[in-house]
Amino acid sequence: MVDHSAALFNKAQNYMPGGVNSPVRAFGAVGGVPRFIKKASGPYLIDVDEKKYIDYVGSWGPMILGHAHPAVIQAAQEAVQNGLSFGAPCENEIKLAALIGEFMPSIEKVRMVNSGTEATMSALRLARGVTGRSKIIKFEGCYHGHADCLLVNAGSGALTFGMPSSPGVPLGTVQDTLTATFNDLDSVAALFEKYSKDIAAIIVEPIAGNMNLIPAAPDFLTGLRELCNQYGSLLIFDEVITGFRVAKGGAQSLYNIRPDLTALGKIIGGGMPVGAYGGRREIMNQLSPEGPVYQAGTLSGNPVAMAAGLATLKELTAENFYSNLKEKTERLVMGILSRAKAAKIPLTANFSCGVFGLIFTSEERVTRYAQAVNGNVEHFRSFFHKMLDNGVYLAPSAFESGFISAAHTNKEVDKTLDIIENIFSVSETYLRISV
């Protein structure tokens, strides 16, 4: 029963568009009643109807330590006692910035903002200001926040301008946004051949987290770095999802590629609203007040967010933190795949440390956006609701990644696998494929 959630959702729709403050939370992609959460602890969520869920959303990525981690709660509580916002610098800004740079050596200087969208938007403005160029390249299926210039669908071909993907985005705003195919270096090279003197930057998720989960091929990222070097453009890694999750040094450390700028968010706030962007010293020095490129924010460097983020990053230095997290992720994903195979369920998966994507498809590997969108969304919807009914909370969208935290133990993972095995064993025939 979800009586209280249903009542709250009905009430919320009177006051908020769709009853939510971020569209995916409304369950529009899966149907049904979104769960209103009352409490979260470790790997669990508890909704207003007192139902407990094993959580694989993790607030969409920030909760790498699990919910209500004692060190993070203590740091936030201590910060709150000293005030909620100063509108002035605080010492923890310096400490967090230094730790970010220690973990990610490509970030020689960093600017704190309030969200991942602010981080990517500001990084692109900086890239344009530094290069004196206007065009950017993004990739079909990669999501970089809701800034106008990034809400773009691919055009009809590699050499066409993008088209707005939302009403309210002026056509003129996106005509400087070029779209290419993720993991297809030739599509990027073609854009450089035509617009070489106009391209300020490439922005890319090194592991794309919003077309389910698709890692970049190593030679693809190497090729992007080489093209940027060749044409004098900047390479921007959007590591809002992957930063400090897939490795202490982010995805850039796994690929051993040094971007010019990096956008961060989620984990660096420990659950508080936060974002950041940083990179090469000479580029970051072009930001106001040192340089001419303007960016500011009333709540940037918020003392509570800085304290929570600093406490979170310190926990990531624990011995075997990432090896343990990777082991749990692999245990979960490989367990799901083996059970799907045994039940003849058409399912594939991609995963990295602490993050995974499940796609209902008979294709063995998914490396492109076109493959991801051809996954069976109806199968996912059925699977999602069966999991939810059995106390497992997945992202309510077939195209969103799942997250696992340090608080998840083999107990939660194995319980999840038992639930999945039962679901697959009794699933409707339309979920099955022939041998």
Curated annotation (Swiss-Prot):
NCBIfam families given in the database record: hemL, PRK00062.1
Q: Which UniProt keywords apply?
A: Cytoplasm, Isomerase, Porphyrin biosynthesis, Pyridoxal phosphate
**EC annotation from Swiss-Prot or TrEMBL:** 5.4.3.8
Ranges that cross the membrane: none
Family the entry assigns: Belongs to the class-III pyridoxal-phosphate-dependent aminotransferase family. HemL subfamily.
Q: Which CDD domains match?
A: OAT_like (cd00610)
GO annotations of cellular component type: cytoplasm
Pathway listed: Porphyrin-containing compound metabolism; protoporphyrin-IX biosynthesis; 5-aminolevulinate from L-glutamyl-tRNA(Glu): step 2/2
Q: Which domain of life is it from?
A: Bacteria
Predominantly, its location class is cytoplasm
This protein's assembly is summarised as: Homodimer.
What's a GO biological-process term for it?
A: protoporphyrinogen IX biosynthetic process
- This one is known as Glutamate-1-semialdehyde 2,1-aminomutase
Species in which this protein is naturally found? Coxiella burnetii (strain Dugway 5J108-111)
Where found?
Cytoplasm
What is the name of the gene encoding this protein? hemL
Q: GO: which molecular function terms?
A: glutamate-1-semialdehyde 2,1-aminomutase activity; pyridoxal phosphate binding; transaminase activity
PTM N6-(pyridoxal phosphate)lysine: list the residues.
K266
The answer to whether the entry has keyword Hydrolase is no
Q: Which reaction does it catalyse?
A: (S)-4-amino-5-oxopentanoate = 5-aminolevulinate
